[in-house]
Amino acid sequence: MKCFAAVGRSDVEDETAVHRHSLRKFQLWAGWDEIHDFILDDVALIDLVKLQKCLRAELTIQFCFQIIQKIHGNIIALERLKTAKKGTYLGPLRLLALEVYEKMHDCGVPSTMLTGQECIADDDSRITASTIEMADFSEEYDIAVIDEAQLTADPDRGHCWTKAILGLKAHEIHVCMSPAAESAVTHLIHLCGDSLAICRYQRKTALICEDTPFSFPESVLPGDALVVFSKKSVLDVAGRLEEEGIKASVIYGSLPPEIRRRQMQLFTSGKTKVVVATDAIGMGLNLPVRRIVFVQTQKFDGTTRRGLTVPEVKQIAGRAGRFELFDTGYVNAMGQESLDYIREQLTQEEEPIEKVSLGFPQILLDLDEPLDVIIKVWKSVEPTPPFEKVRVDEILSLYAQAERYRNDIYGFDDKRILYRMISCPIDIKDHQVVLQWLRYCKDYPADKRLKHPDKGAGSKLGLQKYETYYRKLDLYYQFSHRFDKIIDEDWLEQERSRTEGTIMQYLSKGKKSYIARCQRCVRMLPVGYPFKICDPCFRHSSIID
């Protein structure tokens, strides 16, 4: 395989300077109506164009059936990564980065794990395993692995995969994904002029959809993963299992990564017989699951409650029958109608992914207009297919929060500082975390260190309170890192450890209080029931109304 010649840093800087000059020149005569075309023609792909100049010799594209994380293709990619003098793994989850780090470490390969929340580094590290957002485009690698690349279409994070596929400087890149992403990802690679080899792998274990619908709790067996689509539903089902004397691990999106890992270890070691999870289980978590049971077949996607799509069903169902542990994986659902729906989805071909997410081009920050205006104008632009712009609603929401205190925020009028603030990844639905973020926006110039977050009194109790506090600890680390503040590493490690221990206590001491009950009559609701009021109470209220 031939080595590539990377373009020098000065070339990139020169090109950026040319575009900045054209931006300023453009502003002398163009109104905001005309800027749409300018963004499309000259700016929208500027970051990608710069990255395209770093050409690679060859890419190995691995298209794997249904779930890609632990089957043959991914194993080959990681085996190749072990041989690299300098290599990197990029994936969607901190847990996946940790898993790769531990595999390399256990094989005697000095490695580093790098995420937005922490860094663990061995001496003389050769391999960096990180979340996709932490990709380093200034480094030159022998081998790189980009995992779950079908997420190029994700409206929130997809631009990170787009940038990595186009911009990583490596002699050999393994891109692992589902078959549905083939057209979109190969289009990106052809933009660079890179050569590629496509390797397709099939699932090694059979996947069987059972004939008889699952009945709760009678049908529960060791090795089952019961899938629902909200944290409340996870704790509800786990509480019902507890009443039946069945110990269960729980996995959901807002659970801190270390707690997820501990819950997984309980299941893997056999200390819990069942796992109850949201669709977070579908994203590469390596668990000894014999059977996936869809307790729910509908999810709320932020806008509407809808049925699961073909890719969602296949991604989750594919967790059943772990390679080299079970010969066969099984899938089931509650009720005949739900089982028929899941069976139908499993037989359908996935629709090809046709969109590729495009990130906000920071070159636009040089425009002499307020930041929110620039972002809103960019948001209104329709890019050339297959590109689709990343969602910017959350950063606009944070901008609105910060604008209320603009006189108290040093650097508010500096668009690059402000963009660094509002693009900090936080849970904007957690009011306490947003308040902590605002405090950091106001206070960050005052000292070399940020103030430690507090647990807060508030109205939150128990588990929710400590999950929020953990998110505040993550924010402390991320904001400190973004603004080059000194991080109190010892304190942070101790606080994380204490908080993780407290959350584990809440999850282990009893979940019966989380069982869903009707808000009117307080009777226990049916398993997987999506509403807060039972049918009899709803019908009664309808008659009265």
Can you say where each PLM-predicted feature lies in the sequence?
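Conserved helicase ATPase core of P-loop NTP-dependent helicases/translocases
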Residues: 113, 119-122, 236, 247-250, ...
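Conserved strand-helix element at the start of the C-terminal RecA-like helicase core
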Residues: 86-97, 174-176, 182, 219-244, ...
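Non-catalytic terminal extensions of ATP-dependent helicases
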Residues: 1-71, 360-545
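Inter-Walker segment of RecA-like/P-loop motor cores
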Residues: 104-140
